[in-house]
Amino acid sequence: MFPITTPSTIPIKWTNNSLCKSFVSGEEYNKQIAVQRTLEAVDGILQKSNGFNIDKLILCIGNDVMHIDTPSGGKTTKGTVQDVDGMFFEHFHIAKRLYINIIETLVSFYPDLHVVYNSSNHDYLTGFCLADTIATYFRNSKNITFDISLQHRKYYTYYNNLIGSTHGDGAKWDLLPLLMADECKEWSETKYRYMFTHHVHHKIGNKDLIGCSIESFRSPSPAD
């Protein structure tokens, strides 16, 4: 979690309710720790943003937030078994409360918030259901907008900046600038272009490709 290079826009992401035991990995990680680290990260971003003339926030949600997509067996959408902490239904309620908490915190500092949902391969169904639930919860908030469509790549224009996000399990990195130029008419109207991915769940160094900078978000898990 970090502010992107345009000083007036901040994307934020919480992902991966996966399980990590200290006797296996050397560090404990569970759903409570994931929530705590996420809230600490949001607080840290808000502190770092203090003093900047920020008039717009972008919050990225989705991206394997549920980690699994079945109520039993701990399996992803395609059936891959995962290590999880707690029940599937617990995950949904925890993620819902966390998203609501984050959004309410952000708009208390900066009143203009755009929430972007990126569908993902671990929780293609329940991730969307969660995003739709959050959008419904804030449906009467005039200063919060949502994009919860199932498009694989989302784009947002902020002055002369074109900001894209995608989960990252589809098109290869070197193709993303070409897809952005083909799919988004604002390509020719903007000077600075960014694409953020999430699939690898850890930070990858910035890559400056033709006409676009690409970066991957990390998750709160110990390995990241």
Language-model segment annotations:
Residues 4-14, 30-144:
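Core catalytic region of metal-dependent phosphoesterases/phosphodiesterases
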Residues 15-17, 63-66, 120-122, 168-169, ...:
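Active-site metal-binding loops of divalent metal-dependent hydrolases
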Residues 17-24:
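Short acidic, Gly/Ser-rich segments with clustered Asp/Glu that frequently serve as metal-coordination loops
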Residues 24-27, 72-74, 177:
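Short coil/turn segments at secondary-structure boundaries
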Residues 107, 134-145, 150, 158-224:
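Conserved beta-sheet core of the metallophosphoesterase superfamily
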